[in-house]
From Swiss-Prot:
Protein name: 3-dehydroquinate synthase
EC number: 4.2.3.4
Family under the similarity heading: Belongs to the sugar phosphate cyclases superfamily. Dehydroquinate synthase family.
PANTHER family: 3-DEHYDROQUINATE SYNTHASE (PTHR43622), 3-DEHYDROQUINATE SYNTHASE, CHLOROPLASTIC (PTHR43622:SF7)
Pathway the protein takes part in: Metabolic intermediate biosynthesis; chorismate biosynthesis; chorismate from D-erythrose 4-phosphate and phosphoenolpyruvate: step 2/7
InterPro entries: Dehydroquinate_synthase, DHQ_synth_AroB, DHQ_synth_fam, DHQS/DOIS_N, DHQS_C
Cofactor binding remark: Binds 1 divalent metal cation per subunit. Can use either Co(2+) or Zn(2+).
Catalytic activity: 7-phospho-2-dehydro-3-deoxy-D-arabino-heptonate = 3-dehydroquinate + phosphate
Listed cofactors: NAD(+); Co(2+); Zn(2+)
Length: 368
């Protein structure tokens, strides 16, 4: 078992990473303040892991809240279901919420914790690779709106993050690949040697070799913890964690939430960010192609939806959270391992990026 720390002063918290942590009270008891616990999960995860988690919560009064599964349910109506149960069961301010599931559950449970009686404790128990390496760490919580992804929410830190790597054994291969988009991101934005490591270990990651998976999660969480510790509320360097996300969120919104998995959209969006960085002269063709090959080896789409036009992208990107004073800012790369957030680029470069034939670009790289 490995322990990392997110350093936020009095709001600091541990990240526990290991196999078969879910049923062990040692990782939960220190972070539960009262007698009552509400476990927020979904119809897919609860049958797999709720019973195991309950073993770690013996001695507490536990209320399970099982929600529909999927990005399409990350909305007000589903959030209200959580509040309905908490109020009906008379949970008070000493209640601890536990998010048992992927990114959707973590985001909604965290937002519910931020709002319920103006703030109660919560613990993240992420069960997908994407949530383990990204969304469970850093305190971003919220829901989607039909006009934009994650536009309604709060920064609200958990008491702890408990990552049981054994939960990945039940993860569909498509979800595993989606999570790898966020793992790869850390190499692209701040850790070029990690790219080399991922190239050498991608087959082992896809095969879920335990030591390799644990190292990938630990390196990813360590990178996220460093960034969050330096910039909790995304006023500066934390925005670099959104590499590929502005393009990716446009894909998710246009296609309908859940049609593309978040990590899939980030994968295609990252290809677009690589291409734009290349067009600006910040990334060589060899670096761009190296990045695309790694994303493709991870099983990710490297071509955005063919039916999406440049105008479609611009319409949705105009609602992005990184837009300031009406100016679109993007996360781009000045070399692999060096991300920047900038709105200082020629509009024609962005337009050319949106109109690039990504199918032809992928085809010219050939098969692995």
């Amino acid at each position: 078992m490995r322990t990392l720390h997110v350093d936020l002063g009095e709001r600091s918290y541990p990240i526990y990473i290991g196999e078969n942590l879910l049923g062990d009270a040692r990782w939960f008891a220190p972070h539960i303040v009262g007698r009552r616990v509400a476990v927020i999960s979904n119809e897919t995860v609860a049958p797999l892991y709720l019973e195991t988690l309950l073993k770690a919560l013996q001695g507490h009064e536990v209320t399970p809240v099982v929600l529909p599964d999927g990005e399409a349910y990350k909305q007000w109506e589903t959030l209200q279901l959580i509040f309905d149960v908490l109020l009906k069961e008379r949970h008070d301010r000493k209640t601890t919420l536990i998010a048992l599931g992927g990114g959707v559950i973590g985001d909604m449970a965290g937002f519910a914790a931020a709002c319920y009686q103006r703030g109660v404790n919560f613990i993240q128990v992420p069960t997908t690779l994407l949530s383990q390496v990204d969304s469970s760490v850093g305190g971003k919580t919220g829901i989607n709106h039909p006009l934009g992804k994650n536009m309604i929410g709060a920064f609200y830190q958990p008491q702890a993050v408990v990552i049981d790597t054994a939960s990945l054994k039940t993860l569909p291969s498509r979800e595993l690949s989606a999570g790898l988009a966020e793992v790869i991101k850390y190499g692209f934005i701040c850790d070029e040697p990690f790219i080399t490591w991922l190239e050498a270990h991608m087959d082992a990651l896809l095969a879920l070799e335990p030591t390799v998976v644990t190292e990938a999660i630990e390196r990813s969480c360590a990178a996220k913890a460093r960034v969050v510790g330096a910039d909790e509320r995304e006023s500066g360097v934390r925005a670099t964690l959104n590499l590929g996300h502005t393009f990716g969120h446009a894909i998710e919104t246009q296609q309908g939430y859940g049609v593309w998995l978040h990590g899939e959209a980030v994968g295609a969006g990252t290809v677009m960010a690589l291409e734009m960085s290349h067009r600006l002269g910040w990334l060589s063709a060899a670096e761009r192609d190296r990045g695309i090959r790694l994303l493709r080896r991870a099983g990710l789409p490297v071509v955005p939806p063919a039916e999406m036009t440049a105008e479609d992208f611009m319409e949705h990107m105009a609602v992005d959270k990184k837009v300031l004073d009406g100016r679109l800012r993007l996360v781009l790369l000045q070399g692999l391992g060096n991300a920047v957030v900038t709105g200082d680029f020629p509009r024609e470069i962005l337009d050319a990026t949106l109109r690039t034939d990504y199918r032809a670009l992928a085809d010219q790289l050939g098969d692995e």
